[in-house]
Amino acid sequence: MSTAARRRLMRDFKRMQTDPPAGVSASPVPDNVMTWNAVIIGPADTPFEDGTFRLVMHFEEQYPNKPPSVKFISEMFHPNVYATGELCLDILQNRWSPTYDVAAVLTSIQSLLNDPNTGSPANVEASNLYKDNRKEYHKRVRETVEKSWED
């Protein structure tokens, strides 16, 4: 069945293949274009450097008018990531625009890794360490980077 959402997701997939953003990749799971597996590589010169973080993206038939739900599968220690792996990111909620595609969502998440919003923490411990004890925060992040290699 070809719906507007599915057609748009196939365009997003084609863009990911022909013009992939640096450090992110994503593709639909076999036989279901509405669910995607994604990987974000931790940005260079950040505590997340060399991490390989896996995510899953779920799209509803209202996409692109409704944002996808995005969840880290890899363990993540970050002020804007809940223990469940779900993200607190404005473009996935109140600042969503149908102009965003899969590449834009993933690059926004990649940017968020080193530029957290501590004013709206999903992980209070990570937020407090980020603000008050950056050395310990970096240590905890590096632990998740090392775990990401085992996924």
Swiss-Prot record:
Determine if Cell inner membrane is one of this entry's keywords. no
Q: What is the lineage of its organism?
A: Eukaryota, Fungi, Dikarya, Ascomycota, Pezizomycotina
Which terms in the GO cellular component ontology are assigned? chromosome, telomeric region; cytoplasm; HULC complex; MUB1-RAD6-UBR2 ubiquitin ligase complex; nucleus; Rad6-Rad18 complex; RAD6-UBR2 ubiquitin ligase complex; UBR1-RAD6 ubiquitin ligase complex
Which GO biological-process labels does this protein carry? cellular response to unfolded protein; cytoplasm protein quality control by the ubiquitin-proteasome system; DNA repair; DNA-templated transcription termination; double-strand break repair via homologous recombination; ERAD pathway; error-free postreplication DNA repair; error-free translesion synthesis
Give the metabolic or biological pathway: Protein modification; protein ubiquitination
Q: Which reaction does it catalyse?
A: S-ubiquitinyl-[E1 ubiquitin-activating enzyme]-L-cysteine + [E2 ubiquitin-conjugating enzyme]-L-cysteine = [E1 ubiquitin-activating enzyme]-L-cysteine + S-ubiquitinyl-[E2 ubiquitin-conjugating enzyme]-L-cysteine
Q: Where does this one sit in the cell?
A: Cytoplasm; Nucleus
Q: Give GO terms: molecular function aspect only.
A: ATP binding; proteasome binding; single-stranded DNA binding; single-stranded DNA helicase activity; ubiquitin conjugating enzyme activity
Q: Which SUPFAM superfamilies match?
A: UBC-like
Organism equals: Neurospora crassa (strain ATCC 24698 / 74-OR23-1A / CBS 708.71 / DSM 1257 / FGSC 987)
Q: Which SMART domains match?
A: UBCc
What family is this protein classified in?
Belongs to the ubiquitin-conjugating enzyme family.
What keywords is this UniProt entry annotated with?
Answer: ATP-binding, Chromatin regulator, Cytoplasm, DNA damage, DNA repair, Nucleotide-binding, Nucleus, Sporulation, Transcription, Transcription regulation, Transferase, Ubl conjugation pathway
- UniProt cross-references to PANTHER family, sorted A to Z: UBIQUITIN-CONJUGATING ENZYME E2
Q: What is this protein called?
A: Ubiquitin-conjugating enzyme E2 2
Q: What does this protein do?
A: Catalyzes the covalent attachment of ubiquitin to other proteins. Plays a role in transcription regulation by catalyzing the monoubiquitination of histone H2B to form H2BK123ub1. H2BK123ub1 gives a specific tag for epigenetic transcriptional activation and is also a prerequisite for H3K4me and H3K79me formation. Also involved in postreplication repair of UV-damaged DNA, in N-end rule-dependent protein degradation and in sporulation.
